[in-house]
């Protein structure tokens, strides 16, 4: 299945249920000649949009001579970033703009002293920026349960099933008719292993358990539940167990790969793995690194049950304590969220853009 069709389908479904401004002139700093330096923390490794981050930062710095953005990559995705953020804030060395994963939203709201974006945009003279450029249900992606807007949606991701059409053909599978259900994925994985000797399937295993959440909830289970006002683990159910069993059975019969993320992704890129379930944000890296035509299909379903996909990706938070740094941070965020910059980010990663129009 062509990736353009997958992108179109996933964007429509995601933005329908949970839902792509020009750069400012920074006139005040231009008048004073003062240069403000801010830090931008992200999780984009070189294989996951890192080059695009550097390109965007360089472009912003070139067009905003009175602001200097210094980017910092944080390993181990959002778990590593959150740990580093805790340490930095404990020592009083706040970064200014941070990519925060949606799955860490409530934790960030409860444990970090962040800058109120509504107040920050108002102070920057653009209090209607969020309302004018984002659908209400998209803004909700970066809101707490009580409606606090703690950040601005930036990267919107969905899990998809990438596959190698050459391995499919060798296994007598039709690349134009990829698996649509988990039963079909299991059968295809076994067929790939039996006929080609290659591993059949791998599911990303990041610490936030995002794809596992999609797996569980698509089978009628829950990752979390609320009891007496407190959020607790909710995956101890028959539906959740049955969902996990699908992947466990593939590993048990030798057709499923249980490995680190980098090992799994490299197996796919090197032509030793038939299918990998991961974020659409890996698209650009896969297309660049693979020697075969990368193909993808939507996240598989459990029979006729509707798939339930939690929003993945990240939103932008501001932690600046200094007023001038806050203004510079907002200027940088407006640039990152501009149609031109979002187009570069989407092309360099595969993420879906959050803006209207």
Per-range role (PLM):
Residues 59, 63-134, 170-172, 274-275, ...:
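Extracytoplasmic "Venus flytrap"/periplasmic binding protein-like
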Residues 186-191, 229-258:
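Glycine-centered hinge/linker elements that transmit conformational signals in sensory
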Residues 33-46, 67-72, 97, 150:
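Short, well-ordered beta-strand elements
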Residues 102-158, 186, 194-196, 214-215, ...:
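Hinge/lid segment of periplasmic solute-binding proteins
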Residues 118-134, 178, 195, 201, ...:
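Short, solvent-exposed loop/beta-turn-alpha elements that line the ligand-binding surface or hinge
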Residues 1-39, 62, 123:
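Short, low-complexity disordered leader/linker segments with a strong preference
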Residues 144-154, 159, 169, 183-232, ...:
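Extracytoplasmic/periplasmic solute-binding protein
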Residues 62-63, 68, 91, 169-171, ...:
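Extracytoplasmic/periplasmic substrate-recognition and gating elements
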